[in-house]
Structure formats: structure tokens, C-alpha cells
Regions:
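Bacterial Sec-dependent N-terminal signal peptides
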Residues: 1-25
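Extended, well-structured beta-strand/loop surface patches
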Residues: 45-96, 103-195, 228
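Short N-terminal segments immediately surrounding and downstream of signal-peptide cleavage
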Residues: 24-42
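C-terminal alpha-helix/helix-terminus motif
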Residues: 5-8, 12, 261, 277-281
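TPR/TPR-like alpha-solenoid helical repeat scaffolds
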Residues: 239-243, 265-282
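A short structural micro-motif
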Residues: 105-106, 243, 260, 279
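Short, hydrophobic/aromatic-rich beta-strand segments within well-structured domains
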Residues: 1, 100-102
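Alpha-helical adaptor scaffolds
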Residues: 185-241, 245-252, 256-260, 266-267
């Protein structure tokens, strides 16, 4: 009986202790918060996840982040970059996939590393043998310090952009691009042989990428047949004519677009057609 009472008391104490530990488990904010950013590029996207340390009065590069040593490019877990499609990064072809992103800073340049082991805590288990790629870029010095490490995409076009990192007074800039033209052209050839033809989308791609403008004009006019008084189609028809060098045709088309927009009380496309008309007059 005494033994039973002893075990019961022990179990009660254990449960009480575990309950106490459970009550003490609280969630607090991270010193270095995590950010995930996604950027569309071409037909795919780039996803970047990293933790953002702050200066907090410390000397960063050359001390907190030693020169000449592999750095996780942030805090906590190593930075992860994921490409849904093949890209070119600073002239290097990168297959679609997920990579751990590290860097080795010096006063004048950075060694950027893409490692095949994407999920690591810091750089403690980093192995150079797992590197997919290393390349160097110049250090970009800034006169004004930035408290929180920040990475972002800038100067983004349909198929190219820049990935920039900045912290304290230092940083770097990477050029990234993707080649989608062959895919899009093959897709256009395929779908234009079907019953439901996306005339406008095909015309828009030809216009934006300097393809056969006569074909683009033919397609936009075919698309326009479904809505012959559309100021939307008129502005694009006029833009194509203007790019072909047909200023007189562009002016006449844009003026039609202005007329239809006014009839429909569409101030946005009235303004857009007027803008093309003004260019055609110049």
C-alpha cells in the first residue's frame, strides 16, 4: 500500500512539474525577424527567405560578420533562394531548384555561394563540397548605414531584374534574368492553330518584344471584331501602328478610340488614346 501511495505521489509530482513547464512555454518575438519575398520573373518566380538582423550598435562587417569567412547571409537559418524556372545569375546558368545562399565578404568584394543543401542552421554545417556555384561581385559601399539587413528585387522587367542586399554601410547587387522567348513563341504557334485563338495576347507579346508588327496588327484587328467600338483595342492598335512608323494611321485610330471612350464615359481610355494621338502628331 505504501509503495502504491509512493508511486501515485511521484506521478502527481511529475504531472505537476510538466504542467509547470508547459505554462512556462511562451512565444516571444524573434530578435531577427524572418522575411519571405516572391518575385515573378518571365513565366516563373523567385522566392527568397531570410532572417533580418539589426546593427544594434555593433560593428558589423569585419567584426560581427568576419571578413573572409562564410556567412549565412542573414541570421538564424541560412538564406534560401528558390527558382521555379532556370535563370541566369550574374552570367551563370542556374537550374530550377532550391539553394542555400551564403556569402563571403571582404572590404572590396563578395563571394556569393549557392549551396545544394538549402536547409541549414547558420553556416555551422556548411560544406564547400556541396556548393553548386561560387562567383564574385563588387562590394557596394553606402554612406548612410541601414539598421536592418534588407534584400529586395529592383529594376524588374518582364524577364530580368536585380537582387540587392544592404546592411550597415555595405551591400551587393546581382543581375538575374530568364529566357522565356522560345517558350512563349512555341506556345503562340501552338495555340494559334486551335479554334479559340488568343489574338490579343499574341499581338501584345509581339508588340512588346519587337516581333512581326504586321502580324501583331492583323491579330489586334481580329480581336477587335468582337468589340468594334472598344477604346481598349483602339489604343493598342494605335500603339502598334505608331511602332511601325505609321503616324497617320496611329493618329486616326487613336482619335477613334477617343471618340468611343467619350461615348462610353471611359476617362481612363480617353486619356490613353489622347496620349497616343499626341505622339502621332509629334
Amino acid at each position: 500500500m505504501k509503495r502504491i501511495l509512493f508511486y501515485a505521489a511521484a506521478m502527481l509530482l511529475a504531472c505537476t512539474t510538466m504542467s509547470s513547464f508547459a505554462q512556462e512555454s511562451i512565444k516571444i518575438p524573434q530578435l531577427s525577424t524572418t522575411q519571405t519575398i516572391e518575385q515573378e520573373l518571365g513565366l516563373g518566380k523567385i522566392t527568397l527567405t531570410y532572417a533580418r538582423p539589426n546593427i544594434r550598435g555593433r560593428k558589423v562587417f569585419g567584426k560581427l560578420v568576419p571578413y573572409g569567412e562564410v556567412w549565412r547571409l542573414g541570421a538564424n537559418s541560412a538564406t534560401i533562394i528558390k527558382f521555379s524556372d532556370e535563370v541566369t545569375l550574374e552570367g551563370n546558368k542556374i537550374p530550377a531548384g532550391e539553394y542555400g545562399m551564403f556569402a563571403i565578404p571582404t572590404q572590396d568584394e563578395w563571394t556569393i555561394i549557392l549551396n545544394k543543401n538549402a536547409h541549414q542552421w547558420g553556416a555551422y554545417t556548411y560544406k564547400e563540397a556541396d556548393d553548386f556555384l561560387r562567383f564574385k561581385v563588387k562590394n557596394v559601399h553606402h554612406d548612410s548605414p541601414l539598421e536592418t539587413m534588407t534584400m529586395w528585387f529592383g529594376n524588374v522587367d518582364m524577364n530580368k531584374g536585380e537582387l540587392e542586399m544592404r546592411w550597415a554601410n555595405e551591400g551587393f547587387l546581382l543581375h538575374v534574368s530568364t529566357d522565356v522567348d522560345a517558350k512563349v513563341m512555341a506556345n503562340i504557334d501552338q495555340v494559334m492553330n486551335k479554334d479559340q485563338k488568343p489574338y490579343f495576347t499574341a499581338a501584345l507579346y509581339y508588340y512588346q518584344n519587337g516581333k512581326d508588327l504586321k502580324q501583331a496588327l492583323e491579330w489586334i484587328r481580329t480581336a477587335e471584331k468582337s468589340e468594334p467600338k472598344s477604346p481598349f483595342y483602339k489604343v493598342w492598335e494605335a500603339r502598334i501602328q505608331l511602332k511601325m512608323g505609321d503616324k497617320a494611321g496611329a493618329l486616326a485610330t487613336a482619335q477613334e478610340g477617343v471618340k468611343y471612350a467619350q461615348e462610353q464615359k471611359d476617362t481612363e481610355y480617353e486619356g490613353l488614346n489622347k496620349a497616343v494621338a499626341d505622339l502621332a502628331k509629334s
